[in-house]
Amino acid sequence: SGSCEFKTCWKAMPPFRKVGNVLKEKFDGATEVEQSEIGSTKVLVPKNSQFKPHTDEDLVYLDSSPDFCDHDLKNGVLGTSGRQCNKTSKAIDGCELMCCGRGFHTDEVEVVERCSCKF
């Protein structure tokens, strides 16, 4: 009576949050590049010569993102004017970030809801 032991290996993704954090970090440190020719070879070099050359692990981009603050139908951007924001948030839904430094108006709204309260 012989027994066999099998080992099975497979690749697995790290937790989604960890992947997101790494991508966000890379996005925040992305370098704007332009195409240049060295001899007959085309290479990507930083648009700003004060930045260090990128590595194969870095994110790079050729074109800047549109300004999402202002209305620009050509690029499909609706802008942020008139949107509702969270006055206390420092995240993307916060008024400081969403209103792009234009300032914002604060409205106090009272919401009345029916509930099944028992006293």
UniProtKB/Swiss-Prot annotation:
GO terms for cellular component: extracellular space. Its main location: secreted. Keywords: Developmental protein, Disulfide bond, Extracellular matrix, Glycoprotein, Lipoprotein, Secreted, Wnt signaling pathway. Palmitoleoylation is required for efficient binding to frizzled receptors. Depalmitoleoylation leads to Wnt signaling pathway inhibition. Belongs to the Wnt family. Ligand for members of the frizzled family of seven transmembrane receptors. Plays an important role in embryonic development. This is Protein Wnt-4. It comes from Meleagris gallopavo (Wild turkey).
